[in-house]
Amino acid sequence: MAAGRLFLSRLRAPFSSMAKSPLEGVSSSRGLHAGRGPRRLSIEGNIAVGKSTFVKLLTKTYPEWHVATEPVATWQNIQAAGTQKACTAQSLGNLLDMMYREPARWSYTFQTFSFLSRLKVQLEPFPEKLLQARKPVQIFERSVYSDRYIFAKNLFENGSLSDIEWHIYQDWHSFLLWEFASRITLHGFIYLQASPQVCLKRLYQRAREEEKGIELAYLEQLHGQHEAWLIHKTTKLHFEALMNIPVLVLDVNDDFSEEVTKQEDLMREVNTFVKNL
């Protein structure tokens, strides 16, 4: 128990002092003081479905919104403890690449680290522009929930996580999410839906080095996990707050990176969805 308390204190440490005073200096007639807190959403979808393109489009269309990107760079460059400055950082390796190369060896390590990095992102104090916004909106690129119900769950089902690793991961995941429940609330999911074949084509186009060994079968597995959770509602969930969160499903099978009309349609749907939350 002592070790658990120490772990929690360290996880809270970067945020606790800031979390007590994020509203200082904000007029009581503006921003969060004016009423409800930010509407918080998560963008979900398969590997290479187009999340990065979608995030850029969101940022351009709604600059007043805060969009937190997936911490992929952190996974690609694990730094030794105590070497926070980039110029002196000692890299311990590319964990994302290690996981794809040897999933049976590194999946548990990767999922533990990816979950913690996502949790830290969702625990960050609200940035100034959210505090000043009349209708604040915060959007995350994936969430602590998809970390478990999509990726970790799939790794267990395809044999990359052992029974004991899956049990331990779920235990930590549940404990930490219950501990921080009030600070990681989400109000909606935006599901970018595309076929595994389309995702594979886009994966080849972006040519991320770590992903060159990914096959269609893996993308089909992840597609099935997304559909079960967000469409068919057959995934067994362990958090009551997740049960009734609305889902906006956006068909992104057609390339929208250069198609202005498609972009406008997508942004219009997102705006309507957010307004109704």
UniProtKB/Swiss-Prot annotation:
Q: Which reaction does it catalyse?
A: 2'-deoxyguanosine + ATP = dGMP + ADP + H(+); 2'-deoxyadenosine + ATP = dAMP + ADP + H(+)
Q: Which GO terms describe its biological process?
A: dAMP salvage; dGTP metabolic process; guanosine metabolic process; mitochondrial ATP synthesis coupled electron transport; negative regulation of neuron projection development; purine deoxyribonucleoside metabolic process
Localization recorded for this chain is: Mitochondrion
InterPro entries, per database record: DCK/DGK (IPR002624), Deoxyribonucleoside_kinase (IPR050566), DNK_dom (IPR031314), P-loop_NTPase (IPR027417)
Top-level lineage group: Eukaryota
This protein's record includes keyword Transcription regulation: no
Q: Where is the transit peptide?
A: 1-39
According to the UniProt record, what class of enzyme is this? transferase
Q: Where does ATP bind?
A: 45-53, 206-208, 254-256
Q: Which residues carry this modification: N6-acetyllysine?
A: K275
- Residues the record lists as binding substrate: E70, Y100, Q111, R118, R142, D147, E211
Q: In which tissues has expression of this protein been reported?
A: Ubiquitous. Highest expression in muscle, brain, liver and lymphoid tissues.
Q: Per UniProt, what is one GO molecular function of this protein?
A: deoxyguanosine kinase activity
Which EC number applies? 2.7.1.113, 2.7.1.76
Gene Ontology cellular-component terms listed: cytoplasm; cytosol; mitochondrial matrix; mitochondrion; nucleus
Task: State what changing N154K does.
Answer: In PEOB4; decreased protein levels
Family (UniProt):
Belongs to the DCK/DGK family.
Say what the protein does.
Answer: Phosphorylates deoxyguanosine and deoxyadenosine in the mitochondrial matrix, with the highest efficiency for deoxyguanosine. In non-replicating cells, where cytosolic dNTP synthesis is down-regulated, mtDNA synthesis depends solely on DGUOK and TK2. Phosphorylates certain nucleoside analogs. Widely used as target of antiviral and chemotherapeutic agents.
Summarize the subunit comment.
Answer: Homodimer.
Protein name, entry field: Deoxyguanosine kinase, mitochondrial
Q: Which organism is it from?
A: Homo sapiens
